[in-house]
Amino acid sequence: MVEIDFNKENEEDYSDPADFVDDVTDDVLVPDVLYKKPTIDEFEGNVFIAGIPVVGAERIARLQSVLKKVLEKLEPGVKIFIPPSPEGGSLGVLLTEWPDSRSAAFAVKSLDGYSFDKNHTFSARFFTDMKKLEAPSDAWTTPVKSEYSDVGDLWWWLQNERCRDQFAISHDKLGIPTVGVFTNMKGNDPELAGDPEKAERANWTETVFTWSPHGSYLSTIHKRGIILWGGKDYARAHRFAHDNVQYIDFSPCETFLDTYLGRLEKKVPESLGFRTGELKKAYSTFELTGRTQLPTWPFFKWSIDEKYFACLKAPEKDKLEREKKIDGISIFESETFELVDKRAVTIENIKHFDWSPTAPILAYYSECTDAVPAEFGLLQVPSMQRLRSARVHNVADAQMFWQKSGKRLAFYTMRYKKKEFRETGEVKYVGGCQYHVDIFEIDKKDVSLMNLPLAEPFIHFDWDPEGDKFCVLVGNTAKATPQVYKIEANSHAPKLVSKLDAGVHFNEVQFAPKGGWLAVLAKVSAGGNVYFIDTSLAEAKRTNVIEHPLFNKGYWDPTGRYFVTCSTLGGRAGADLGYRIFTFQGRELCRKNLDRLAQFKWRPRPPVKLSEQKQNEIRKNLKKTAAKFVKQDDDEKCRASQEVVEKRRKIMAAFDVIRNRNRECLENTRHLRIALRDGVDTEAQLDEDEFVDEEITIALSTSKTAAPLSEEDERD
């Protein structure tokens, strides 16, 4: 055996130098230890609660007992900890630990805003959110209050003596994106609405523009946020900061503005105070939908009185972390931006919903499964009472259509007999499909329901806004037929009033905003036909058919007097971009071709604020008022004719001046031309006596005719 002496003084030293830096990371050396390092995910079940009573050390046990009872109503397994003050009392905050992240999320929603007693209200936040809070910057200063920006009369455009409407367009002018606001001039080219330098601007928006619902403001989108323009000079009225915003939406009464970033890393829909610019609420996209991106926009849908807004509830997950179908609607109060009754409304398999145009009533549709039929119905808010519902089996597709008056709601359903799944995952319906329109009459007792079966496939539907008629477009692309129905009192089914001539490629019907007139559109088709139909008669009558090949958009103006067809970017390739304006009867008034036309939007009008008595008075004197406008139109035509005649006279007078000046110059230089031509005056008038009349006969056509034989020829 060899003896080793560890105490040798001359043993070689293997230590690292003092300035040595190891390039091997801890992830390589000790991955098993780092795996156990606490992460922020471990605190997902922890909730921080502020607003608890501040008590002394002698009352801590009593406070802890009371808080435990309150929290155990939500989850028996909750653990609590009250951070002590230096004296042993409470600091007014509470740390809680819940079994999992779901129960913690439920606790946050339930406890945030909870009234513990008359003097204490809880404020609950995830502990992970508290960890993300940063200290205020040292350079932070108190914001300076901005001065009020007076842009003038926001409704100046409504005071036009001829009641003319305005519209805005976005197109390229000399290769530069330009937005302009125009006044529609009946029978003449549109004119810029106001100062030409202010009503039309290059690069006014970086993406798109939008009118506010009442037409008070024109909104433009920029990289740093949204700007609202108003007044006669289109001055900047408001600015809302939201970097890289892509989508915006107004509440019905112009009180709130919803914004969304879209396909960016930070995806947060926000709701802003429209007139103050104050950020009211910012929502987490993942919290709202369970996804990193919103499925549709506008995501929030507002009630007409702006008291509530709603969205589909985020889908939950089962024990295997598989996403379930959406089973409810989240309805928020605009005053507090919190859920009504602190919870969502449960509706299994809900697909979509929509608010009534006149009342806080929600219409919803939940799709069917193999075991559960489809359901469509009406929900009263905030009582959450279901006014009426109906269930139908084997529904493949459904759509809903509210009448503008809010009196009726139509549901279209396509029902199949049997379905099969192909290898590609595509669904095939076997045995044909049936098409139905179910109509809820909201103003009737217990909300009556009537059914209308359709003999042909459904294409589109629209209501007469204030009347009792509607139009259903049925058929296919080769033959589409508009059918007009009427709902009569005490009737159990709609009555077919007119079945109009079928057309090719019709795909949409639109009633005028004031009713009576109907447009049937064949958008994005080579023919580009539009039927104009008068439905105010006992039997609907087609008044005109117009053509605008490949147009992809059509709109009524807010008054229902004019209809525009547009070919814009994003339509069918090869279309001539531009717009055409027609009367409600289909007579063309204006045609404009524009380079890279992107948008055409009529300026909305605010709701009528007149009393019922005043409206009846206007209807009573409508003939006199109409005669006045007819006279103004005739005078304008005469004035236009006189202007044309006067313009022609001025042009002729200017031409005579030029002609006389040139004739005088020609006469003064005549002797020079005679000298150049060896004394021959080629410009002198010829003597008529030197002319000789000569007639020349020209045969225009010839023919061969057999001559009769003479007597001698006959004898020979």
Swiss-Prot record:
One of its GO terms (molecular function) is RNA binding. Disulfide bonds: none annotated. Keywords: Cytoplasm, Initiation factor, Protein biosynthesis, Repeat, RNA-binding, WD repeat. SUPFAM superfamilies: DPP6 N-terminal domain-like (SSF82171). Signal peptide: none annotated. GO terms for cellular component: eukaryotic 43S preinitiation complex; eukaryotic 48S preinitiation complex; eukaryotic translation initiation factor 3 complex. It is found in: Cytoplasm. Pfam families: eIF2A (PF08662). InterPro entries: 6-blade_b-propeller_TolB-like (IPR011042), EIF3B (IPR011400), Nucleotide-bd_a/b_plait_sf (IPR012677), TIF_beta_prop-like (IPR013979). GO terms for biological process: formation of cytoplasmic translation initiation complex; regulation of translational initiation; translational initiation. WD repeats lie at residues 195-233, 235-283, 345-386, 411-450, 453-495, 501-543, 545-585. Residues 45-129 form the RRM domain. Component of the eukaryotic translation initiation factor 3 (eIF-3) complex. Belongs to the eIF-3 subunit B family. RNA-binding component of the eukaryotic translation initiation factor 3 (eIF-3) complex, which is involved in protein synthesis of a specialized repertoire of mRNAs and, together with other initiation factors, stimulates binding of mRNA and methionyl-tRNAi to the 40S ribosome. The eIF-3 complex specifically targets and initiates translation of a subset of mRNAs involved in cell proliferation. This is Eukaryotic translation initiation factor 3 subunit B. The lineage of its organism: Eukaryota, Metazoa, Ecdysozoa, Nematoda, Chromadorea. The gene is eif-3.B.
